[in-house]
Amino acid sequence: MDAYIGIDVACKKDKYCPISICVKKDGILIPLQLANERAQSPKGLGNIATLSEVNNLAYATAIKKYILAICKSHQLNPVCIAIDSPLQPRAEHLKRRRAELELDKRKISCYTTPSKADFDNIIVKANRHIASGGKANKLPHSMQIFMLAGFAIANALKDVAPCIEIYPHATVKLLDVAGKHKTKDDQAYIQLQALSKFTGWPSTQCEWDQVPYICKGPTHDKVDAYSAAWIASLAQSDRLALGESEASDAIWLPILEHLIVHTVLQKFTPTAEIMPTKRNKKTPSETNIGEHTKLCPACHAHMFKRWPFGWDAHAAHKCTGVDGVNIEARKRIYKERFL
């Protein structure tokens, strides 16, 4: 069976690289439940380690080994790999890549991909920062350094299957669900609902319950990896290249007008409690008891007096917004969604 792979390149130290491996059944793009596998995707080494070509080669090799192992165990044939990263540095004679200029025309923001010479200077500057005692979280050009890992990953995987560059932010812009940052509130689930109309998954409550197991990592990274796999699964005639694909300078988007729109059962209703945002800590004098009262985000019937205290007992026995009779399974599902 053919496999379509999406990689949300991650370099954060000790963070699993989000990788979604999908198959198509009756036109539905179904992700493997990789978080349940014994083997897990490699962890990022951190931005400082990513400055080293040797480290990036090792990371990319580990990702390749992981993908091949999963495909072998499931008897899958990798057909296309979509990577959320530039596949190579910008050409020296360009100020911005052609793909980035196309994004500019569509008013979609993105970081400029440095050229090889630019990266040489970035590495020197970053190493000087470290040598002078600078903190890792203040590393200059931190939002571009991850691209070095992306280059290595693309190079390592090019003999596994054709690799294409995608940009999840551009994808959700096209789907008209980019109004809020993906890490805020329930935005990742809103984006996944929009995707599901074209992938056919998830379409039932049971499938929504499987979302946490697509791969390791935060929900928004899982959704990015799955959306990448979706574009990898499309025929080339159903994809639009922003830039010049012949020059390996293209970001691919779906051509929605070419695609079947699935009728999916939207049983899952996203709520703001699924992905809580960080809030400033308050002193006891600034906090009143009313701020702790909360309507259950699953059943919308039970009122917690001091959220989230008591969630486990409620989820295990009384909550009508969680399916199933197994107590531990009910608590796990509730915790994955709302805590």
Could you describe each region identified by the protein language model?
Residues 114-116, 284, 308:
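Short linear motifs centered on Gly/Pro in flexible linkers and helix caps
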Residues 307-330, 334:
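C-terminal recognition-helix end and immediately following basic linker
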Residues 275, 337-339:
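Short intrinsically disordered terminal tails
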Residues 1-5, 9-277:
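RNase H-like (RuvC/DEDD) metal-dependent nuclease/polynucleotide-processing core
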Residues 290-291, 314:
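Flanking scaffold residues of small Cys/His-coordinated metal-binding clusters
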